[in-house]
Amino acid sequence: RCCGYKFCYIC
């Protein structure tokens, strides 16, 4: 899953 603000982080 992708999450975060401005950038994509693995959740």
From Swiss-Prot:
Subcellular location field: Secreted
Tissue expression: Expressed by the venom duct.
Disulfide linkage: C2-C11, C3-C8
GO CC annotation: extracellular region
Gene Ontology MF terms: toxin activity
Stated family: Belongs to the conotoxin T superfamily.
The name this protein goes by in its record: Conotoxin ar5b
Organism: Conus araneosus
Lineage per the UniProt record: Eukaryota, Metazoa, Spiralia, Lophotrochozoa, Mollusca
